[in-house]
Swiss-Prot record:
The lineage of its organism: Bacteria, Pseudomonadati, Pseudomonadota, Alphaproteobacteria, Hyphomicrobiales. One of its GO terms (molecular function) is proton-transporting ATP synthase activity, rotational mechanism. It catalyses: ATP + H2O + 4 H(+)(in) = ADP + phosphate + 5 H(+)(out). The gene is atpA. Its EC number is 7.1.2.2. ATP binds at residues 169-176. Gene3D superfamilies: 2.40.30.20, ATP synthase alpha/beta chain, C-terminal domain, P-loop containing nucleotide triphosphate hydrolases. F-type ATPases have 2 components, CF(1) - the catalytic core - and CF(0) - the membrane proton channel. CF(1) has five subunits: alpha(3), beta(3), gamma(1), delta(1), epsilon(1). CF(0) has three main subunits: a(1), b(2) and c(9-12). The alpha and beta chains form an alternating ring which encloses part of the gamma chain. CF(1) is attached to CF(0) by a central stalk formed by the gamma and epsilon chains, while a peripheral stalk is formed by the delta and b chains. This is ATP synthase subunit alpha. It is a peripheral membrane protein. It comes from Methylobacterium radiotolerans (strain ATCC 27329 / DSM 1819 / JCM 2831 / NBRC 15690 / NCIMB 10815 / 0-1). GO terms for cellular component: plasma membrane; proton-transporting ATP synthase complex. The keyword Metal-binding does not apply. Produces ATP from ADP in the presence of a proton gradient across the membrane. The alpha chain is a regulatory subunit. InterPro entries: ATP_synth_asu-like_sf, ATP_synth_asu_C, ATP_synth_asu_C_sf, ATP_synth_F1_a_nt-bd_dom, ATP_synth_F1_asu, ATPase_a/bsu_AS, ATPase_F1/V1/A1_a/bsu_N, ATPase_F1/V1/A1_a/bsu_N_sf.
Amino acid sequence: MDIRAAEISAILKDQIKNFGEEAEVSEVGQVLSVGDGIARAYGLDNVQAGEMVEFESGVRGMALNLEQDNVGIVIFGSDREIKEGQTVKRTGAIVDVPVGKGLLGRVVDALGNPIDGKGPIQSTERRRVDVKAPGIIPRKSVHEPMATGLKAIDALIPVGRGQRELIIGDRQTGKTAIALDTILNQKPGHTAGGDEKAKLYCIYVAIGQKRSTVAQFVKVLEDQGALEYSIVIAATASDAAPMQFIAPFAGCAMGEYFRDNGMHAVIVYDDLSKQAVAYRQMSLLLRRPPGREAYPGDVFYLHSRLLERAAKMGDAAGAGSLTALPVIETQANDVSAYIPTNVISITDGQIFLETDLFYQGVRPAVNVGLSVSRVGSSAQTKAMKKVAGKIKGELAQYREMAAFAQFGSDLDASTQALLNRGSRLTELLKQPQFSPLKMEEQVAVIYAGVNGYLDKLPVTKVRAFEDSLLSTLRSKHKDLLDSIAASKDLSDENAGKLKSVVESVAKSIG
């Protein structure tokens, strides 16, 4: 038999060339115990903190506790399919989510998977959920207004782009309503051909809420045409605690895409109390030592590292911004509990909502005395500064006098005038839901209030006066509104025109 060496080597070489099967090497461990959404695994010696791991059933988890002899893993989803003795493998990736404009108009879960039935997400970029906040040098101080469309907030507690403003109050005081109105108020900026700098993209993170509530919220956004520039991230009450814990970080990563690309975004965390509760549950099950109110020692760091990522970037970094509106729910107006005091100390001010005001019909139920913006008038336009400067002082005096006026009946004329003005200004700051006002319209309304044009009207007619003034301005004096909007200032000429319009409307109502 003739053995042809050249032929055999050619065949072998040919076969080796076509051999493309590469062995996949992955580090695996073994599940020691599982329960309550927490698994402990042996092995996984080189796993990183915060790394995504995968169980046999396809369920994913995140390694949080790296101990000497085992790894504590929180499970994203149900732990029913995970059994003791099963294998768990590293993925090598830290938890990340899809980001970009492809997410606009969508409802996703805490890991960025679509839950709205509209097909897969069109996104090419992914970002880690937990990254370091920008340093001191790339930032710039907050100087542009982030209009909420609510008179009580834009005039008295202005929020700027890049600010963190806390919305705090008991249940059912209208916290989500303020966030919703803020999102709806951004619609004019998103009209076709609008300036990218004027646009404000909105991200709403629902943490531990009822599914019906989230569905209702999404429906309002859809009906009002606001979903197209918004992203909704939902980790509802029935989702596992790790999903509720990670959702705000996932939302923040999506918001940072806009901030880092020279665009502007606002993110609402509704609410961080429930995130803290989910984190407490995870920490206690991982056997981390409890601290005050059984929260873990690093619950302050949990919220501070999240909220520090909201920032106004300097020109060198693209001049983008991410504004955060965290929501905290208090129990019986107790602002001195652990989580509320933590978040108040982290944020740049708070909007304090009160049940009593809400039931008195003052809506939005903002307690102007306890609410504050630590950015202040640098987040207002010149026009708003001119008219809103007075209103703060007058309302403060009114609150002080109203407390004394309960005791005495014989008040001198100046005190009576102050009380009259205060009650009318309070009435003026009321606003129905889903009716945000543009900056120039707010300026006109507040101008009428602080310059005494309402003092002669009965309090019951203040609402009618406001409606009449706005409809007159919109129909007959649109040029005046446009001029204030363009210059962002109330010039003497415009103030004169506005004065004559206000006087004629006051006459017709009075």
